[in-house]
Amino acid sequence: MPLVALGVADLFNFVDYSKTSLAISAAAIAFNPTFWNIVARREYRTKFLTRAFGGNAQVACYFLAVTIFGLGLVRDFLYERALRDQPSHPLLEGTYVKYAAYALLALGNLLVITSTMRLGITGTFLGDYFGILMDGIVTGFPFNVTSAPMYYGSTMSFLGTALLYGKPAGLLLTAWVLFVYIIAIQFENPFTAEIYAKRDRERAKAAGTSKKEL
């Protein structure tokens, strides 16, 4: 088949939807943020993890962090396996595509790593839900580029991997990753904002009480 005939519109004809590994990868991608949002909200309301670790919120948060990190490794393994089961597309096998893939992987990992360095373990892995709040909003890089560097950096890494393998199925799964993360952000941002708003209201109330006592 001539390369010209293999246009962009033809990309998704190179996705083998019958492969079980594709569905499993898509399920893992959706499961992870669903899992950590459910667990974190339950922790916020009931402190079930903190109680399980003898009242130590820090240790409980680290436990959730390790769990989330482990699930991320499983998700990445399943994604790579799904790509290996899929056909490649000639348009995605060029030299410049590979350069773009490496650039996306580098930038994606830069966003993820620097955001983790800015927030720390508890800031990255939902410490707010455990009552471990940061003093203020982080505004330095990468948060001056995007408000969700972990999510967008991860999406860039998924896209970079898809291009590196030359797999249209990877592009499809990357679009799914982005969709899932955007939905997660819609749930997480307002909830987290309310946690800090509540902290600020309590501080203001305490300050007002102190002034009255004086």
UniProtKB/Swiss-Prot annotation:
Keyword flag Secreted: no
Record pathway: Phospholipid metabolism; phosphatidylcholine biosynthesis
Transmembrane stretches, start-end: 53-74, 102-122, 166-186
A Pfam family assignment: PEMT
Domain of life: Eukaryota
Lumenal side stretches: 1-19, 41-52, 123-165
Lipid metabolism keyword on record: yes
Principal location listed in the UniProt entry: endoplasmic reticulum
GO molecular function: phosphatidyl-N-methylethanolamine N-methyltransferase activity
GO cellular component, one term: endoplasmic reticulum membrane
InterPro entries, sorted: PEMT/MFAP, Phopholipid_MeTrfase
Catalyzed chemical reaction(s): a 1,2-diacyl-sn-glycero-3-phospho-N-methylethanolamine + S-adenosyl-L-methionine = a 1,2-diacyl-sn-glycero-3-phospho-N,N-dimethylethanolamine + S-adenosyl-L-homocysteine + H(+); a 1,2-diacyl-sn-glycero-3-phospho-N,N-dimethylethanolamine + S-adenosyl-L-methionine = a 1,2-diacyl-sn-glycero-3-phosphocholine + S-adenosyl-L-homocysteine + H(+)
UniProt KW keywords: Endoplasmic reticulum, Lipid biosynthesis, Lipid metabolism, Membrane, Methyltransferase, Mitochondrion, Phospholipid biosynthesis, Phospholipid metabolism, S-adenosyl-L-methionine, Transferase, Transmembrane, Transmembrane helix
Top-tier EC class: transferase
Binding positions for S-adenosyl-L-methionine per the UniProt entry: A106, L107, G108, E188, N189
Annotated localization: Endoplasmic reticulum membrane; Mitochondrion membrane
GO biological process terms held by the UniProt record: methylation; phosphatidylcholine biosynthetic process
pH-dependent activity: Optimum pH is 8.0.
EC number annotated for this UniProt entry: 2.1.1.71
Function according to Swiss-Prot or TrEMBL: Catalyzes the second two steps of the methylation pathway of phosphatidylcholine biosynthesis, the SAM-dependent methylation of phosphatidylmonomethylethanolamine (PMME) to phosphatidyldimethylethanolamine (PDME) and of PDME to phosphatidylcholine (PC).
PANTHER family: PHOSPHATIDYLETHANOLAMINE N-METHYLTRANSFERASE
Protein name from the UniProt record: Phosphatidyl-N-methylethanolamine N-methyltransferase
Organism: Neurospora crassa (strain ATCC 24698 / 74-OR23-1A / CBS 708.71 / DSM 1257 / FGSC 987)
Taxonomy of the source species: Eukaryota, Fungi, Dikarya, Ascomycota, Pezizomycotina
